[in-house]
Amino acid sequence: MNRLCLVFLLSCALVGCASTSPPVVLSPYPALHDELFTSYEAFPVETEEEVFYLSPEAKAFVDRATIISGGSAHHKSVKKLVSAIFDHSEMGLLYRNNANSTADTTFNNRAANCLSLSIMTYAMAQHAGFEAKFYEVDIPEYWTRREGFSFLNGHINLRVGISKDPTVMNIGPSFADVDFDPQMLRNHFPRINVTKKRILAMFYNNKGADALISNSYTRAYSYFRAAAVLAPELEQSWVNLGVLYRMVGEFDYAQQSYDYALNLNENNLTAWENLAILHRHKGEMDRADEIKVMVDFRRKSNPFYHFILGEQALEEGRYEEALTFYQRALRLDNTRHEVVFGMSKVYYALGDISSAERFLKRAVLLAPNEQD
């Protein structure tokens, strides 16, 4: 089983902005191995300016949205900007877990995940003269499946507030919390303020994952490397580098990368799980089993752990096992549309159409938006 650990929130064609590529940085980190991917510089990553760039059309949208009718350019509304962004998003937005895009591409394509939507909103708020802060939400481990891989999902939202510029007068509330997954806001998960640099590293990490599952290993290394150099405290980058090293047969380097992630956070269960997978590839079954028992024990109360096991069993045609896993997940949390939809899928596979339809209707009612 392959599992990638990343803050996966989504790949569209990127806008080519007038900007030079960021300089290649010589890294002191021993878990980076440029010698394995000698042509990685042929795959330059987007600069910060490119990721947060807004076209004149997008800036005009912000200007129209924020200025109060009948007021001057100095009278602006946080609430109007946030409302306009959601209105724009609702006109055909596709929420996709694989749509990792720059701010301007998100605006034009209206297909993105919450990281890309948050990047776009941040750029728009800054153009309007507002202050914006990113927050990383501490959600339970939550996976999705894509092309045979399991992806650990993180979640980002932000707060848009009035500027400290005394020449700009805000009309209405002084700030707004912006979250493109309404369930996250309702559940009031704790969150911490994170830097723009960390957000950019998350973006690179997601792009690296896109490249990895497309078997573009050198491109993947370029993105993971950029993320690791920019924000070495981001555990996911080191875990993903470990997956990449394992996939190209460099087991010692994979071990080194997982160890680096665990030195940052010894409770990173995805790093431990990938380490178990590595031991299994090396024929060290006892150590692999020992780690797996520990990981399973610590995850058993997480509905998404059972959910992803159900997804994997369903993919492999083990329908009765899948049903058991989905039922366990449902007992732990019966409000998640993903779990309820899983029940619908497995009942359909088992030929129980009546139950499949019943759970499908429940899933539709629980889904926060039409795309889900």
List the model feature ranges, each with a label:
Residues 97-238, 247, 252-272:
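Long, contiguous interaction/recruitment modules in multidomain scaffold/adaptor proteins
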Residues 43-105:
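Secondary-structure boundary elements
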Residues 213, 247-248, 277, 281-282, ...:
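Register position in tetratricopeptide repeats
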